[in-house]
Amino acid sequence: MFNFAPKQTTEMKKLLFTLVFVLGSMATALAENYPYRADYLWLTVPNHADWLYKTGERAKVEVSFCLYGMPQNVEVAYEIGPDMMPATSSGKVTLKNGRAVIDMGTMKKPGFLDMRLSVDGKYQHHVKVGFSPELLKPYTKNPQDFDAFWKANLDEARKTPVSVSCNKVDKYTTDAFDCYLLKIKTDRRHSIYGYLTKPKKAGKYPVVLCPPGAGIKTIKEPMRSTFYAKNGFIRLEMEIHGLNPEMTDEQFKEITTAFDYENGYLTNGLDDRDNYYMKHVYVACVRAIDYLTSLPDWDGKNVFVQGGSQGGALSLVTAGLDPRVTACVANHPALSDMAGYLDNRAGGYPHFNRLKNMFTPEKVNTMAYYDVVNFARRITCPVYITWGYNDNVCPPTTSYIVWNLITAPKESLITPINEHWTTSETNYTQMLWLKKQVK
């Protein structure tokens, strides 16, 4: 039975349906799957409940389009193509009693097909289904000197002792936990900022590092995940650019102009593995663990990492670099098989195929030292990963590639309906999973 509740309350590993509300006022924008109020409703129901098929099997999807909940006999235009790639077929179908079945076809190789739908060229939706994704493999090579490269960089960074300035933030402190604004010097040239929350009650606690999603930004909502501190965790939410969250808007604007464009740092120095911007970021994550494990109220056993998108990537990177990490949670990880477009299929965020001259031999070589797939190979702690099939930021193709490479104990919450988001319920569930990992 369909549930037309205005808010999603549960995510299941195998979703039967995708319900997509498309706001009329946002009709020309890329619509998320669950705006809470809308006049229009798409329903797309693959004929396999888990949205997965074997290569060679044909996928069929029942499509419905409703206005105010009433089925519409409208013409639907559609295009079908591989995940993140140009369409290879297109067509139109007129709905009868508000419904039609579209044959999406199949794939000869493992991957995902994406069907992009529209009514009147305005009301848009898409749905992706997978074909033997458990067989997907990375394009990215595993450099022979990968481990030596990162050991040398961490050794060099550790010549600079971790130094921390720590100021209590009364406006974020409650009866249950204390909050501190930290500035951590992570190597000779770089520092990061972070908010540390920890239980008010004296004791020994697990530590959790939370790296950020992509962008040039400060930490805007330090109170959004305080349920960690309330459940007995010391948690550090960090940024990666040395941007003080208490700076003024004018200061922020002045500093960020140096970054060229919003996520330009992800291309900065990509010609040379030793000069790539993300080198100090990966090192900073490990140095943050150095700091957390020096705290007198750390329990001496449990070191967790948790994040989404770029933060999911950095969580996996840290787990692959640092054997002290005892459990890892990642949502739809970015920076995964970034050169995958050279295999004529989807690659990972930041989608270098959209820029010029990004796949030179030098840049592809550098990518291999920073790609999540090569850290995933090295993870030994338990891992919990969540991803959705409709994600066009961190596509399911690359999430599966990362998942397939992990040989450590692992669990997944696959939510086919999801684009680039998770619900608050999922985020809380991940905290509960970490709680189960406490030794």
Curated annotation (Swiss-Prot):
Optimum pH is 6.0 with glucose-pentaacetate as substrate. Active from pH 5.0 to 8.0. Belongs to the carbohydrate esterase 7 family. Pathway: Glycan degradation; xylan degradation. It comes from Xylanibacter ruminicola (strain ATCC 19189 / DSM 19721 / CIP 105475 / JCM 8958 / 23) (Prevotella ruminicola). Its EC number is 3.1.1.-. Keywords: Carbohydrate metabolism, Hydrolase, Polysaccharide degradation, Serine esterase, Signal, Xylan degradation. The gene is axe7A. Involved in degradation of plant cell wall polysaccharides. Has acetyl esterase activity towards a broad range of substrates including xylose-tetraacetate, 4-O-methylumbelliferyl acetate, glucose-pentaacetate, cephalosporin C, and acetylated xylo-oligosaccharides smaller than xylo-heptaose. Displays no detectable activity on polymeric acetylated xylan. Disulfide bonds: none annotated. The active site is at residues 309, 391, 420. Pfam families: AXE1 (PF05448). It comes from the Bacteria. Optimum temperature is 40 degrees Celsius with glucose-pentaacetate as substrate. Active from 30 to 50 degrees Celsius. At temperatures of 30 degrees Celsius and lower, less than 10% of the maximum activity is left. At 50 degrees Celsius, retains 60% of its maximum activity. The keyword Lyase does not apply. InterPro entries: AB_hydrolase_fold, AXE1_dom, CE7. GO terms for molecular function: carboxylic ester hydrolase activity. This is Acetyl esterase Axe7A. GO terms for biological process: xylan catabolic process. Residues 1-31 form the signal peptide.
